[in-house]
Amino acid sequence: MIPGEIITKSTEVEINNHHPETVIEVENTGDRPIQVGSHFHFYEANAALDFEREMAYGKHLDIPAGAAVRFEPGDKKEVQLVEYAGKRKIFGFRGMVNGPIDESRVYRPTDENDEYAGVFGDNGAENVNKKGRKRS
């Protein structure tokens, strides 16, 4: 053995096994490239990314830690997401959750007059979280 040498097994390493998977189609509708990292809460990804946000709630990309997926302007691709494990609490990112991952906390706009409707350029059709406020 050489000092500092790391000896690893020659077998393949499985990541995120035993976690339910979700596949969604994502399109970059913006005019700049967007990169999303492995542990970023995909639900809170850049608003120029068009996808079914509710399906991404509580999930991150199913890729190795430290990796990222890049979306060039106009790109449309499928990505695989997995649920967060552990205590299932999310803080930071875009500040849309800041607490436990709980479907009852997902804010759903009620009509076109809702002050938060249209945040994602969809006239309120998408679901967004309103700083932990419970839906009615």
From Swiss-Prot:
Q: Output one GO MF annotation.
A: urease activity
What pathway is this protein said to act in by its record? Nitrogen metabolism; urea degradation; CO(2) and NH(3) from urea (urease route): step 1/1
Record's Gene Ontology CC terms? urease complex
Q: Name the enzyme group at the top EC level.
A: hydrolase
Q: What Enzyme Commission number(s) apply to this enzyme?
A: 3.5.1.5
Question: Where is the stretch described as Disordered?
Answer: 113-136
UniProt KW Cell inner membrane keyword: no
Q: What family is this protein classified in?
A: Belongs to the urease beta subunit family.
| Protein name from the UniProt record | Urease subunit beta
